[in-house]
Amino acid sequence: MIYDFLLSLGFISRIPINIKVKAFEVRVKRLPIYFPLVGYIPGILFFFGGSFENFLLKILFLILGYYFFDLFHFDGFLDTLDGFLNQSSKEKRLEIMSKGDVGPFAVFFGTLYVVVFWTLYLEIPPITFIYSSVFGRYSMNLLMFFSKPAKKTGLGALFFPFQKKNLLFSSFFLLPLLFSMKYFFISYVVTVVFSYLMSIVSNSKIGGVTGDVLGGACLMTNGLLLVVLGVV
């Protein structure tokens, strides 16, 4: 369990994990189980940052959370926006996403996301960041459960065929968040609904999901939950 968790941590963050992997193609399909568990780490960083009154400490924890975790998904978020909002064929959208060039859609919505995140970081209860970070990573499992790979290569394709039992196993890591039934219920419903809708959109745009889409969905769910939990 610890071995797989560390591999999962290294897979969806910038934290270097130097572990020799045996039977990689088999083991990598188990990694999504631990995605929600990984989400507790940036969630706790943002929680502490939001709890401190000192402005410099707020900045420090924000940088740590983004540098080691959220920036990893922010890249996918930007690529997904540029690809999905481009009025062209599925093949062209996939090409745009694979190139990774930052286009106007990515610049605008990426900037908007950061501004909204920063505003909420200063205003809403810090505990909401734990919920949003954990459920944001959980959304990647839901998206894989609902969808299929858009192409046969790439990081996203490694997890397919997605083992349905992994969704159940990963759900156990949500249980500590039951201490607030209201936040848990809202987070769960929003995450499931958004992930399902995202799978429909992604299938329509590019014929499935990619690693960029998974990362983008994680960040979109994260931001959406912060907005929703911040107003309830």
UniProtKB/Swiss-Prot annotation:
Reactions it catalyzes: alpha-ribazole + adenosylcob(III)inamide-GDP = adenosylcob(III)alamin + GMP + H(+); alpha-ribazole 5'-phosphate + adenosylcob(III)inamide-GDP = adenosylcob(III)alamin 5'-phosphate + GMP + H(+)
PANTHER family (alphabetical): ADENOSYLCOBINAMIDE-GDP RIBAZOLETRANSFERASE
Lipid bilayer topology: Multi-pass membrane protein
EC code(s) of this entry: 2.7.8.26
Source lineage: Bacteria, Thermotogati, Thermotogota, Thermotogae, Thermotogales
Biological source species: Thermosipho melanesiensis (strain DSM 12029 / CIP 104789 / BI429)
EC class name: transferase
Cofactor names: Mg(2+)
Keywords assigned by UniProt, alphabetized: Cell inner membrane, Cell membrane, Cobalamin biosynthesis, Magnesium, Membrane, Transferase, Transmembrane, Transmembrane helix
Name of the protein this chain belongs to: Adenosylcobinamide-GDP ribazoletransferase
GO molecular function ontology, one term from the record: adenosylcobinamide-GDP ribazoletransferase activity
UniProt-annotated location(s): Cell inner membrane
Example of a GO biological process term: cobalamin biosynthetic process
